[in-house]
Amino acid sequence: MKWEKNMVYFGREQAWGAALGAGLGAGVGMASGASKVGTAALSGAGFAAGMKVGQLAEMPTPVAILTVMEAEKIDVGVLLKQGFIDALGKTSTLKVVGDDEPADAQIQLTVAEWGFRLTQGFSSVIYPTLNVVAQMNRGDEMIWRTSEAVTPFNGQNVYGYTPLTYRTDPEALRRALTGITQISGRYLVQELK
């Protein structure tokens, strides 16, 4: 299982930045960090896992989400691996063995991209996203490879919340990331058949 903790984030503050800067460089507002306007708009945010009140509100949204994930031990890699194993156990004849046990093939799951995105320009709700590459090797031979993306437009992705919710409700964040990793696990196992 491989995943980078670098998150892709495109929320309302980035949409506003892109819209305002369209004539002079549309990409200005699309940086991963929230703008000062976006940060100020979210200044009512609370705290998580011992953070001082307002401390999360001062952070750009992506940094605040990563801070909550770290404090609450929410690991996309662990969630994805479990979602894949659960889906495999329900629908496949393949047997999963422990990491240190001998196997006739190895499956590598790699999170190519993950984060949060809007469904439309100025919505107040962002949805978790996940793009996973799965590959099965037997020795040096690749015998299967696929990728699956869960986007805000996926009908099963019902885990949209406001940035404020993701900042202040660790269980909503956990529920959203667990949900999309389970969706991804099911899709990947369907491709494996």
Question: Positions of the model-derived regions?
Answer:
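C-terminal/domain-edge helix-coil "capping" segments
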Residues: 74, 81-83, 89-96, 143-193
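Short, solvent-exposed, polar/charged sequence segments at loop or secondary-structure edges
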Residues: 65-115
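A generic structural signal for ordered alpha-helices
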Residues: 58, 62, 66, 112-114, ...
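A structural "domain/chain start" motif
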Residues: 1-80, 84-86, 189-193
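Surface-exposed short loop/turn segments
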Residues: 5-21, 29-34, 38-40, 95, ...
